[in-house]
């Protein structure tokens, strides 16, 4: 694809809601499956930093789903430009792009709307369809719809789908809702208890954990064909203005190549697809392995341990002693390594579970990790490096996010995290010239030079040099 695309048609819709828990993911997956069953190609996207919803999109489409995060991409205009480029890059070849919002439509950083689904719609000029929970409500839903559409002059809201409502109730109130709100009624979705997705502390359970997910998706799609106005949704999507882009930022990767081992299994599954692609562009050849099921780290020049749910597999991870020993040897030998959140947890000496049992883990970093009863250091942050390290020089900054119920007896102190929309700050991350590990997650579309520097370190190791 050319580095600059001007006026490219990308039919698209963003499905948003007044609040979390409105059933957006269910409706989005139903729509994606229905479009697939019609023989149409869809590109799926998720507003914000969430890892789990894109896994559901991917299971439906058999192709990756991509995050569009205005904060992680660099905030303000750089973030908006990166979102447009990402939407163009992955959406231009599809029949339609479906974007799923996060939280409430206007909910952003602090008490404002920065990095919200609303700001994403504004940045990408995308029509918005509200998914509203209709349980126990009648005409009052018109006030919700009208308020959501009128809260900002440029709300981009064009229509609505009422979720968890009987079709006959929807038909009874449909005209009144349209008249009062000025929005187009685009269908409804009844409550389907047999097709719900369970939740846990970090959100929905992952797609791979759901029994008969394919059957549930088929049932959801069949229902969508009955009660959602799919043809009208497609017509709304085609009315979206062409997208223009200014091209991706200059990127000068190392000319060599290196093998980057990436942990990916039930315990470690939180990765941004675009981050992996940036690493490939920087010179990394990706190989995937399982800390749960494999006996040792595969031959590699670098290591990336992402987040996930290692706490759910504490015993199995502990009992895989050969993998733990293999990782410990590699890290003791200064293998370049990124460890985010769950990956950082796994490298500790041990994990203490909710029953106060202590499970030995890799032991490459000091201290132990443990679960708590509440979210720790939740939300967007800006990280500032306090020393030169594998990624950057002292004083450099990057946008990031944290979302975890676990904690550590030693979170590191080589970066400082500044909470967005707040005066709070705290030390975090262990970093040196070959290792960076901590709870924050970053997106390499927001910091391509960090990806290039990491891969360069892997290449230098392969070539027998020790430069960054």
Where are these regions (language model features)?
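Internal gly/pro-rich beta-alpha loop/helix module
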Residues: 138-252
